[in-house]
Regions:
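Post-transcriptional modification and biogenesis factors for structured RNAs
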Residues: 117
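ATP-dependent small-molecule kinase phosphotransfer cores
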Residues: 1-64
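Short, intrinsically disordered, charge-balanced linker/junction segments flanking boundaries
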Residues: 72, 121-123
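A glycine- and Lys/Arg-enriched "phosphate-lid" helix/loop adjacent to the NTP-binding pocket
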Residues: 42-113
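PAPS-dependent sulfotransferases, especially Golgi type II membrane carbohydrate sulfotransferases
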Residues: 96, 120-121
Length: 123
């Protein structure tokens, strides 16, 4: 799968999530907690897959519209620890996704991407 296709698929899924789950929950006054949202797209597809960040943002804007989180928390796990966790998961299940199959440089780019996002949008 190309990086561009991955970007579009992730955001197609996110568009469905926003319309089918997030909007109704917000309309009902519920509190929502998502483990990943649009910053993940910027980090993984923009920085990790090295796609044009302006184009990535355009796709994100189309997918989520004006639905933006009130707060984003970033919890960074040192890469050696995340590598060990990934290896442990991989030993337990033979099925791996594209992110788990990516090389270490991909993980490093993703981490730097998250750090850049956090620096650009401090609380």
């Amino acid at each position: 799968m190309t990086a561009e296709a991955e970007l579009l698929l992730m955001n197609a899924s996110r568009a469905q999530l926003v319309r089918e789950i997030i909007h109704p929950a917000l309309a009902a006054g519920e509190l929502l907690l998502c483990d990943r949202f649009y910053d993940s797209t910027t980090a993984y597809q923009g920085h990790g897959r090295q796609l044009n960040l302006a184009q990535v943002q355009t796709v994100i804007d189309f997918a989520v519209g004006s639905t933006w989180p009130d707060l984003t928390l970033l919890m960074l796990v040192p890469l050696p620890i995340s590598d060990a966790r990934r290896r442990s998961r991989n030993e337990q299940t033979p099925v791996r996704d594209r992110m788990e199959e990516a090389d270490r440089s991909f993980s490093e780019r993703v981490e730097r991407g998250y750090q850049a996002i956090a620096a650009a949008e401090p609380v």
